[in-house]
Amino acid sequence: KLGCTRVEIGAQTIYDDVFDLVKRGHHTDATIHASQLLKDAAFKISYHMMPNLPGSNVERDIAMFKELFDNSAYRPDMIKVYPCMVVPFSELKLWYEQGRHRPYTDEELLEIIFRIKPNFPRYLRVTRLIRDIPATSIIGGSKVSNLRQVAQRMMHEKGIVCQCIRCREIREQPIDV
């Protein structure tokens, strides 16, 4: 009636121990339940995923993205990937200062991207690959605001191919007419 066709879910992770550590207030069963209700009602689903949350690591985050598309309980139509960043006035800032949380380096983030993007299904649209937070507000984490472009250029140079919708769009391809 109101024209809504897509719902975005701040899933962030699929790991209950990470949800507990960051005091999210729910577990992955809530993400699965919400996803099923939305799929049953014919909505498109977009997940917001957050690698580098406390309690995770590079290998675990890579496995998380694999599970998102191997497990039919998830399988969003779109995703936004927002690596966790340390910002002022947050509990995470205290953890960072105490050495309880270490943000990924740009190299670690790029490794995750290189390893997950080739496995993205053809139906998936990646609508964002890093949150647009001013570098002056980031205490810990990547300050590269064009991480998607950097990753795509490096993937092209290394011969790594992604099949997601955005990477296959004609607007970025040379046309032979």
Predicted regions, residues:
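Conserved non-cysteine loop/helix-boundary elements of the Radical SAM core domain that shape
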Residues: 1-46, 50-107
